[in-house]
């Protein structure tokens, strides 16, 4: 059976971070799940389990600029339907403060964030990279049955003052997809991959 390639282009954000191995000591981390199985309307769902937050409010941001391109690409414009929940599944208030940032006032209650990601390839209209279009190698692509280009800065953001803690990223996918990445997959299953990095 022909293999379908899922391109996990982790270079921009996560590849620049040091890989780490899981330890037996429980430590603070951000847990991320990217669902490449249940794709609807060309959008991928991302779930972020929040670390312990002691502040009264917290911001969650998707990058505006990434190393290597240095253009104002505003990856937050590709995020839809961002929601925050407490540990009982109750919706928390979320305020979008700019194109790339969301503020959660009841931060101490925050358990998880969910949102949908659109890909950048579909939005390229020939306006030019650094204008309205995003430089393709730094972009994201969602083509069910063909490929996914998962540049992490287009899928995963960061909490204010929490960029220096580890990230555990789990990607669920059909068994016919395999990930092309230089990172070490800590999950041996055929339908999921897991990567751990020391910081955002």
Model-derived features with residue positions:
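Bacterial Sec-dependent N-terminal signal peptides
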Residues: 1-29
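Non-catalytic, glycine-rich low-complexity segments
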Residues: 21-38, 48
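Short structured motifs
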Residues: 30-34, 45-47, 97-101, 151-155
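A surface-exposed beta-strand-loop module
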Residues: 36-37, 68-134, 159
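Surface-exposed beta-strand/loop patches in extracellular or lumenal glycoproteins
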Residues: 44-76, 156-174
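A short, structured loop/turn motif at beta-sheet edges
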Residues: 51-57, 87-90, 105-110, 172-176
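Extended, low-hydrophobicity, Ser/Thr/Pro/Gly-biased non-transmembrane segments
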Residues: 114-200
């Amino acid at each position: 059976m022909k293999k379908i390639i899922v391109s996990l282009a982790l270079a921009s954000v996560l590849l620049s971070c040091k890989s780490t191995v899981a330890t037996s000591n429980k430590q603070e981390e951000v847990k991320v799940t990217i669902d490449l199985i249940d794709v609807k309307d060309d959008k991928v769902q991302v779930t972020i389990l929040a670390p312990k937050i002691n502040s009264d409010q917290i911001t969650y941001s998707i990058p505006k600029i990434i190393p290597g391109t240095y253009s104002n690409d505003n990856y937050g414009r590709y995020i839809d339907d961002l929601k925050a929940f407490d540990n009982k599944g109750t919706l928390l208030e979320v305020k979008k403060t700019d194109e790339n940032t969301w503020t959660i006032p009841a931060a101490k209650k925050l358990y998880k964030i969910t949102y949908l990601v659109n890909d950048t390839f579909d939005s390229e209209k020939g306006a030019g990279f650094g204008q309205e279009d995003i430089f393709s190698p730094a972009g994201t692509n969602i083509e069910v049955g063909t490929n996914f280009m998962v540049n992490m800065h287009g899928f995963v953001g960061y909490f204010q003052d929490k960029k220096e803690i580890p990230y555990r990223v789990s990607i669920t996918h059909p068994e016919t997809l395999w990930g092309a990445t230089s990172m070490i997959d800590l999950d041996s299953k055929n339908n999921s991959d897991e990567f751990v990095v020391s910081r955002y």
